Amino acid sequence: MIQLWGDSRLRSKNDTILKAIKGESTSHTPVWFMRQAGRSQPEYRKLKEKYSLFEITHQPELCAYVTHLPVDNYQTDAAVLYKDIMTPLKPIGVDVEIKSGIGPVISNPIQTVKDVERLSQIDPKRDVPYVLDTIKLLTEEKLNVPLIGFTGAPFTLASYMIEGGPSKNYNFTKAMMYRDEETWFALMNHLVDISIDYVVAQVEAGAEIIQIFDSWVGALNVKDYRYYIKPAMNKLISGIKAYYDVPIILFGVGASHLINEWNDLPIDVLGLDWRTTIKQADKMGVNKAIQGNLDPSILLAPWDVIESRLKDILNQGLNRGKYIFNLGHGVFPEVKPETLRKVTEFVHNYTAK
């Protein structure tokens, strides 16, 4: 295992977020926004008039530009690589496309263990060189904040692959778990294997933090999570850490009932959505760094409302330490860029030491 937290590997001048994760003293609370690269930026919307999401991510210069924009425009303390959690699925044989207004749509959903056996492994240098080239390009451009790479969690990826797209109830996914454990665990193991290779390649290319998005896992109860999901998550996170001791953030939506399960995992940061306060997480015994958790909808409110909510969350974060400010989900397209800029400035000033 290679230690990435030391000065010898640290490329970023602004290492505030890395210090916060470790519980070290920082000059201010670090800020970044999920989906900060993309939808709310006018420059990005102009690009989208010409290119699809996958077309942008396949062109390292464009992708690096989109990734870098919020760091320049909002002065965030981290950059998050612009790509989709579906990115590693196409190379392994999943026919996926992103449809406007719908999201990922998969034409060959997984139904049997034979479908899983037909999936290939991933060779990131061969299959997703554009992702690695984008990371290297950002590093060469001397990005002055840590770059966050990411992957989808096995359950969330599997739910898309089984349902064929977004779902409200995950009926097909749960049905497979309950009636066909052979196929379910084969799929989990395959997704863990490709995700480890995919994440390790991102770290080797220059990513300094990894976020695992388990967007839909809140659909499961605790008992099912422990049996059907948690072993795969342990294997994924431990597998990454066997190569590099890179900081790992875990985030999901509507999953407050799983906080204790997440706290058991070898992650470094637990991402909260807006439904659970930092105080509540602390009372539940969370001993990781915490990230979150302003309701994204608040950013559409008048500034006095935003400021009031910011103060409440920031005070909780300041009281506990080991805290990163973020939203409780991704930035909405309707949010004005100047609002994000103002939020970052407020967080930096309000928490300045």
Swiss-Prot record:
PROSITE patterns: UROD_1, UROD_2
Site, Transition state stabilizer: residue positions: D84
Pathway in which the depicted protein is active: Porphyrin-containing compound metabolism; protoporphyrin-IX biosynthesis; coproporphyrinogen-III from 5-aminolevulinate: step 4/4
Reaction equation(s) it catalyzes: uroporphyrinogen III + 4 H(+) = coproporphyrinogen III + 4 CO2
InterPro entries linked: UROD/MetE-like_sf, Uroporphyrinogen_deCO2ase_HemE, Uroporphyrinogen_deCOase
Family: Belongs to the uroporphyrinogen decarboxylase family.
Protein name, entry field: Uroporphyrinogen decarboxylase
Record lineage: Bacteria, Bacillati, Bacillota, Bacilli, Bacillales
Recorded name of the encoding gene: hemE
